[in-house]
Amino acid sequence: MPREIREIKDFLVTVRNKDAKEIRIKKVGKNLTKFKVRCGRYLYTLRVADNAKAAKLMQTLPPSIPTVQVDSNKK
């Protein structure tokens, strides 16, 4: 079940949960970046429209959780 998180602080708290398994980063278009964290029950999604904030958030992610960069497939 997907859940959307709107605040960066809430996303960082969710990423540091014990049941967080994987973080997927997906760039959509020029400015939009989606961060998805798979937890035990839900898939949490954060949308960041600013490239500078997205780059800063990538640096603050915990290294203990595997991070996967996903390419957006445009048809």
Curated annotation (Swiss-Prot):
Domain of life: Eukaryota
Entry GO terms, CC: cytosolic large ribosomal subunit
GO biological process: protein-RNA complex assembly; translation
Keyword field: Ribonucleoprotein, Ribosomal protein
Statement: the UniProt record of this protein carries the keyword Cell inner membrane: no
UniProt family annotation: Belongs to the eukaryotic ribosomal protein eL38 family.
Protein name according to UniProt: Large ribosomal subunit protein eL38
Lineage: Eukaryota, Amoebozoa, Evosea, Eumycetozoa, Dictyostelia
